[in-house]
Amino acid sequence: MERALPAAGFLYWVGASTIAYLTLRASYSLFRAFQVWCVGNQAFVGPRLGEWAVVTGGTDGIGKSYAEELAKRGMKIVLISRSQDKLKEVSNNIKEKFNVETRTIAVDFSLDDIYDKIKTGLSGLEIGVLVNNVGMSYEYPEYFLEIPDLDNTIKKLININVLSICKVTRLVLPGMVERSKGVILNISSASGMLPVPLLTVYSATKAFVDFFSQCLHEEYKSKGIFVQSVLPFFVATKLAKIRKPTLDKPSAETFVKSAIKTVGLQTRTTGYVIHAIMGSINSILPRWIYFKTIMGFNKSLRNRYLKKTKKN
């Protein structure tokens, strides 16, 4: 009995220490959640970083909402997208609504010979914020070998989702480093957090965006550059083919108002509190449950799409 007492005492302190550690960890997590989602960092992004903000894919959805939010904060806006008509319309609306200067650069990011034109268009500008938003996804969930026009689709997905981020960052980052300040927001996706079968190439490109962002932040944070990977779940946009916003599928405007307050607080964010909860649930699910669920969901979307197109 006497020999058991020291062992019991040791186990008591191990248990007490474990409980104290878990309590502190939970308390810190709750504090951080309150700081990020309730308080936010509203003043981090603005003209103090530089006169201009550059937004790729800025004529629709999340990109357009970022451009409007940055203009609202007093930044001049450069929109880079494919359609000159849309660029003109959105830039004029931003100019009139927020009384800021705007510029446009019309390029097709599926091509790889566009970056000299972008370089010329950005020459001489004091760029404080870069939003790498341009992206494309599948027309519908599909098995890899059955993707229509597979070779061309692979090339376009890589050029638009991967090459564009590397090349535009290459053009903008030197000026930020020279001035020792700047923010780069790379729009990834929740599909980049965990593998998404039937969206295989898209999911892989978004995982690249996430890793690229994390690495770039570590390389350049000492130079005053903040790089954030933004990983939203569904947002009501044309790309996502969702028209009506809901609590878990916010409008692009609602999403961006939430996401921009996380800049300076999180280098990796879902951007929206409901999406943060969804991400936490996904991260603790056993992989077999996750894959069974996501395969079932995407198979259902695939079958629905193919049935609809067959009717038409």
Swiss-Prot record:
Q: Which InterPro entries match?
A: NAD(P)-bd_dom_sf, Sc_DH/Rdtase_CS, SDR_fam, VLCFA-Steroid_DH
Residues in a coiled coil are none
Which cysteine pairs are covalently linked by disulfides here? none
Q: Where is the active site?
A: Y202 (proton acceptor)
According to the record, the segments passing through the membrane are 4-24, 182-202, 271-291
Protein family per UniProt: Belongs to the short-chain dehydrogenases/reductases (SDR) family. 17-beta-HSD 3 subfamily.
Q: What does this protein do?
A: Catalyzes the second of the four reactions of the long-chain fatty acids elongation cycle. This endoplasmic reticulum-bound enzymatic process, allows the addition of two carbons to the chain of long- and very long-chain fatty acids/VLCFAs per cycle. This enzyme has a 3-ketoacyl-CoA reductase activity, reducing 3-ketoacyl-CoA to 3-hydroxyacyl-CoA, within each cycle of fatty acid elongation. Thereby, it may participate in the production of VLCFAs of different chain lengths that are involved in multiple biological processes as precursors of membrane lipids and lipid mediators.
What's the protein name? Very-long-chain 3-oxoacyl-CoA reductase
Q: Which gene encodes it?
A: Hsd17b12
